[in-house]
């Protein structure tokens, strides 16, 4: 299984590609950062990120895309750009019929280091070790993208949807899923005039 990990960002969007073989054997394929210049308009920045992600998906034809789930941060502009980049990754995957999984930073850290509160340098070292790399991937966005791909490969739920996936959710993930379902129901009911 080829897994493409995405660490979303508007200036630097990390992309890491691995292969998960039998017995969870992981192999490095590619790592890169898709960039957009802060000197161009927002629409052109989004287009640059979308085109870069689309090119990677077309080039590597992943079986799954693993994207960092965006959480609120204190810097509104940062979270907006990150959420937009995550949405572009989901769109590019959906257009190609590729299943998408969202993983929190804590999940990725836990999967790769065994510690959900691990520091960035610990994650980078473990990514390097797990994938047998000769040096740490840089910048950090690239290492994070590989960590997300590794997380997806090692998670028992993977990209499963529905009940089987729900067995493996943390309490916070269950609350998030319930809130998303309730929001969807409210929207559908309001569209029907209920």
Swiss-Prot record:
Q: Where is this region: Disordered?
A: 162-194
One GO biological-process annotation of the entry reads: DNA repair
Q: Where is the active site?
A: 7, 68, 141
Q: What catalytic activity does the UniProt entry give for this protein?
A: Endonucleolytic cleavage at a junction such as a reciprocal single-stranded crossover between two homologous DNA duplexes (Holliday junction)
One Gene Ontology term, aspect cellular component = Holliday junction resolvase complex
Ordered alphabetically, the record's keywords are: Cytoplasm, DNA damage, DNA recombination, DNA repair, DNA-binding, Endonuclease, Hydrolase, Magnesium, Metal-binding, Nuclease
The record's section on InterPro entries has: RNaseH-like_sf, RNaseH_sf, X-over_junc_endoDNase_Mg_BS, X-over_junc_endoDNase_RuvC
User: What does the note accompanying the cofactor annotation read?
Assistant: Binds 2 Mg(2+) ion per subunit.
Subunit details: Homodimer which binds Holliday junction (HJ) DNA. The HJ becomes 2-fold symmetrical on binding to RuvC with unstacked arms; it has a different conformation from HJ DNA in complex with RuvA. In the full resolvosome a probable DNA-RuvA(4)-RuvB(12)-RuvC(2) complex forms which resolves the HJ.
Please describe what this protein does: The RuvA-RuvB-RuvC complex processes Holliday junction (HJ) DNA during genetic recombination and DNA repair. Endonuclease that resolves HJ intermediates. Cleaves cruciform DNA by making single-stranded nicks across the HJ at symmetrical positions within the homologous arms, yielding a 5'-phosphate and a 3'-hydroxyl group; requires a central core of homology in the junction. The consensus cleavage sequence is 5'-(A/T)TT(C/G)-3'. Cleavage occurs on the 3'-side of the TT dinucleotide at the point of strand exchange.
NCBIfam families membership = ruvC
Q: What is this protein called?
A: Crossover junction endodeoxyribonuclease RuvC
Q: Which organism is it from?
A: Bifidobacterium longum subsp. infantis (strain ATCC 15697 / DSM 20088 / JCM 1222 / NCTC 11817 / S12)
């Amino acid at each position: 299984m080829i897994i493409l990990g995405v660490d979303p960002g508007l200036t630097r969007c990390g992309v890491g590609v691995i292969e998960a073989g039998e017995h969870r054997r992981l192999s490095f394929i590619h790592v890169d950062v898709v960039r957009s210049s802060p000197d161009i308009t927002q629409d052109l920045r989004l287009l640059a990120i979308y085109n870069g992600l689309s090119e990677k998906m077309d080039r590597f034809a992943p079986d799954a895309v693993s994207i960092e789930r965006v959480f609120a941060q204190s810097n509104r502009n940062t979270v907006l750009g990150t959420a937009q980049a995550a949405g572009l990754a989901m769109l590019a995957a959906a257009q190609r019929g590729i299943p998408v999984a969202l993983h929190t930073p804590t999940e990725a850290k836990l999967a790769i280091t065994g510690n959900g509160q691990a520091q960035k340098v610990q994650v980078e070292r473990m990514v390097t070790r797990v994938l047998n790399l000769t040096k740490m991937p840089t910048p950090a966005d690239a290492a994070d993208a590989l960590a997300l791909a590794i997380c997806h490969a090692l998670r028992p739920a993977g990209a499963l949807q529905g009940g089987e996936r729900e067995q493996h959710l943390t309490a916070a993930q269950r609350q998030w899923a319930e809130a998303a379902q309730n929001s969807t129901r409210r929207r559908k009911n309001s569209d029907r005039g209920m």
